[in-house]
């Protein structure tokens, strides 16, 4: 096996362990990786990996201090602004289309739906990361596009 393959396997195993287990010390992580066949792993390597992947120590449900990885990029968090979740807004003659981070479309669609006809929105359909918005009759798609861009402070 090539070095890059070994490194990829180590990274996958490391991330999986931190997601699935509760490790209170770097030594526990070293032991778990050695049990998976990574014999050359040591505490300093684990320390560098924890730093590289942004791992932090936090309290779990049992109030124990454990290492965990931050949420994956693009996944909404409590502190995420809705504006940060909107990646692109575009339109054609019939629809306004919003592209979001993975899993964020339904949250944003719910907000848009709540604005309703008073804001020129006839209906909203959301998938995982794409939203289709249809304007009401008196509102043009261009007007709705501009309103949605203002709402999310999108300048794209």
Swiss-Prot record:
UniProt main location, coarse: cytoplasm
Keyword terms, alphabetized: Amino-acid biosynthesis, Arginine biosynthesis, Cytoplasm, DNA-binding, Repressor, Transcription, Transcription regulation
A GO CC term attached to the entry: cytoplasm
GO MF, any single term: DNA binding
Pathway: Amino-acid biosynthesis; L-arginine biosynthesis [regulation]
SUPFAM superfamilies: C-terminal domain of arginine repressor, Winged helix' DNA-binding domain
Pfam families from the UniProt entry: Arg_repressor (PF01316), Arg_repressor_C (PF02863)
GO biological process, one term: L-arginine biosynthetic process
InterPro entries on file: Arg_repress (IPR001669), Arg_repress_C (IPR020899), Arg_repress_C_sf (IPR036251), Arg_repress_DNA-bd (IPR020900), WH-like_DNA-bd_sf (IPR036388), WH_DNA-bd_sf (IPR036390)
UniProt-listed Gene3D superfamilies: 3.30.1360.40, Winged helix-like DNA-binding domain superfamily/Winged helix DNA-binding domain
Localization per Swiss-Prot or TrEMBL: Cytoplasm
Keyword RNA-binding: no
Keyword hit for Protease: no
Biological role: Regulates arginine biosynthesis genes.
NCBIfam families (UniProt xref): argR_whole, PRK05066.1
Family annotation (HAMAP family): Arg_repressor (MF_00173)
Similarity comment text for this entry: Belongs to the ArgR family.
Name this protein carries in UniProt: Arginine repressor
Native source organism of the sequence: Vibrio campbellii (strain ATCC BAA-1116)
Organism placement in taxonomy: Bacteria, Pseudomonadati, Pseudomonadota, Gammaproteobacteria, Vibrionales
């Amino acid at each position: 096996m090539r070095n890059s393959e070994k490194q990829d396997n180590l990274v996958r195993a490391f991330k999986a362990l931190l997601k699935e287990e509760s490790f209170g010390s770097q030594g526990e992580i070293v032991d778990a990786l050695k049990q998976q066949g990574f014999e050359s792993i040591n505490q300093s390597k684990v320390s560098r990996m924890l730093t590289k992947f942004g791992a932090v120590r936090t309290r779990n449900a049992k109030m124990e201090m454990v290492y965990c990885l931050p949420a994956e990029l693009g996944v909404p968090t409590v502190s995420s602004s809705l504006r940060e979740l909107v990646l692109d807004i575009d339109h054609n003659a019939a629809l306004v289309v919003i592209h979001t981070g993975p899993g964020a479309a339904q949250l944003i669609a719910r907000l848009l739906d709540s604005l309703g006809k008073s804001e020129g929105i006839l209906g909203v359909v959301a998938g995982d990361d794409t939203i289709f918005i249809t304007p009401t009759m008196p509102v043009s798609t261009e007007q709705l596009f501009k309103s949605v861009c203002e709402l999310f402070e999108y300048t794209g």
